[in-house]
């Protein structure tokens, strides 16, 4: 049987990928990156390639190990943050950030806002601490057509307080001057940026009978 060989851009591994939570071809066995991490890495390379990041200050919420290493070597100042994680620089609530206005050039918070009760307050705070022309990358898992707000955190969904829909990113227009959206279909398929789903699973970002794409919003103050 022919093997599916992929390339992980985060660690340069080349070979088969592991299943993760029932999703085939999901996890790199070397650095443990998932589909979204490999997709995000390629978009980060694209949007940062013409930036002098050695002069930029960055804030990274809920830092992913592979991306943490990438950011740490790139930015002049790099701060990791989370409300509960112990191995970060500072424990803070994204709804009430302790930083002065216009502190950071770059903010990265992936799969964070679906956990935040007042995501509008969080978006306000992110914009507040961004410098003029600052950039924020704020992807969430799009799982339905229209966003559903839960009355309380759902323990079966890692305590998500909402199911983000195709309309979710419309909220960003109230806080940022512009947003660019990137799709899994725009990057090298060899990194395997798609999520494999069952044939009977309805998803608004399905691209064929077994794959769904992801979307990354890159927001500018």
Predicted regions and their residues:
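A mid-sequence, solvent-exposed acidic-amphipathic segment
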Residues: 93-96, 111, 116-117, 126
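Short, well-ordered alpha-helix to beta-strand connector turns
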Residues: 55, 75-76, 104, 126, ...
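Conserved N-terminal segment of class I S-adenosyl-L-methionine
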Residues: 1-98, 190-193, 209-218
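S-adenosyl-L-methionine-dependent methyltransferase catalytic module, highlighting the catalytic core
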Residues: 117-127, 131-221
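Hydrophobic beta-strand segment of the Class I
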Residues: 99, 107-108
């Amino acid at each position: 049987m022919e093997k599916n060989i992929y390339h992980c851009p985060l660690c340069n591994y080349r070979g088969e990928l592991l299943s993760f939570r029932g999703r085939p071809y999901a996890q790199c066995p070397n650095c443990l990156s998932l589909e979204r991490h490999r997709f995000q890495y390629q978009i980060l390379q694209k949007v940062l390639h013409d930036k002098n990041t050695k002069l930029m200050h960055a804030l990274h919420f809920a830092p992913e190990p592979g991306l943490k290493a990438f950011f740490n070597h790139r930015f002049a100042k790099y701060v990791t943050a989370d409300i509960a994680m112990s191995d970060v620089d500072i424990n803070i609530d994204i709804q009430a950030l302790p930083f002065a206005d216009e502190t950071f050039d770059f903010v990265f918070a992936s799969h964070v806002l679906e956990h935040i009760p007042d995501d509008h307050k969080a978006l306000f705070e992110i914009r507040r601490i961004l410098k003029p022309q600052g950039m924020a990358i704020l992807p969430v898992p799009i799982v339905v057509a229209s966003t559903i707000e839960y009355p309380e955190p759902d323990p079966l969904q890692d305590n998500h307080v909402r199911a983000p829909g195709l309309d979710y990113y419309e909220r960003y227009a109230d806080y940022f001057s512009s947003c660019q959206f990137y799709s899994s279909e725009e990057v090298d398929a060899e990194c395997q940026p798609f999520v494999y789903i069952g044939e009977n699973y309805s998803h608004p970002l399905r691209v064929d009978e077994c794959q769904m794409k992801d979307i990354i919003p890159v927001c500018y103050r």
